[in-house]
């Protein structure tokens, strides 16, 4: 795996609140190696460990992107949704930021059928065909289109399972993580002090509740993906 310098700055992470964990009563003992202190009733994450695993994750996504691999970013809670969409669009990744529909990856054939329906309805809307239908039929199909846009809009160009999945908040996206594990899809996961660090292929200990923390971690990963894609374009 390529080793590169990703400008991961501990002071920058502190300013973003990456080090703030959950309350000391709400933690997973398996996170002990990633916790450096307790302060005012909350655990403090060891940012040196965060920097190490974030750097490893950046190396992984850079190498994958340089080989033309596809990524999916998953983060559906309100604090993560906008950052996930922005990061994914910037790096030309697929994303899910509203709700992970059970079986989205393990039952890919059903997801693929929904995506075909979604694309067909988008085409009908763009060509004006929907507006030429009876009002009742048009209204029903427009509702379907709106529903599909909400839940599948971020994966509308996906033609197969992703090569790597990046997950924001292990507990919130546990179903997505379990599906990836079942299928053997490599995962990178932000883990707070209440998570299990042994589930994902690379777990990045970080505050998964603060927007600034989520955005910082995603920005580093996205930069690495973009760098990798540039390398792939230059060396096809």
From Swiss-Prot:
- What top-level branch of life does the organism fall under? Eukaryota
Q: Which GO terms describe its molecular function?
A: structural constituent of ribosome
**Gene Ontology annotations of biological process type:** translation
CDD domains, alphabetized: RPS2 (cd01425)
What are its GO cellular component terms? chloroplast; mitochondrial small ribosomal subunit
Q: Name one Pfam family in it.
A: Ribosomal_S2
Question: Main site of residence?
Answer: plastid
Enumerate the InterPro entries for this protein: Ribosomal_uS2, Ribosomal_uS2_bac/mit/plastid, Ribosomal_uS2_CS, Ribosomal_uS2_flav_dom_sf
Question: Which of UniProt's keywords are assigned here?
Answer: Chloroplast, Plastid, Ribonucleoprotein, Ribosomal protein
Where found in the cell? Plastid, Chloroplast
State the family named in the UniProt similarity comment for this chain: Belongs to the universal ribosomal protein uS2 family.
Q: Mind telling me which HAMAP family this protein's record contains?
A: Ribosomal_uS2_B (MF_00291_B)
Protein name in the entry: Small ribosomal subunit protein uS2c
Give the species. Vitis vinifera
Upper classification of the source organism reads: Eukaryota, Viridiplantae, Streptophyta, Embryophyta, Tracheophyta
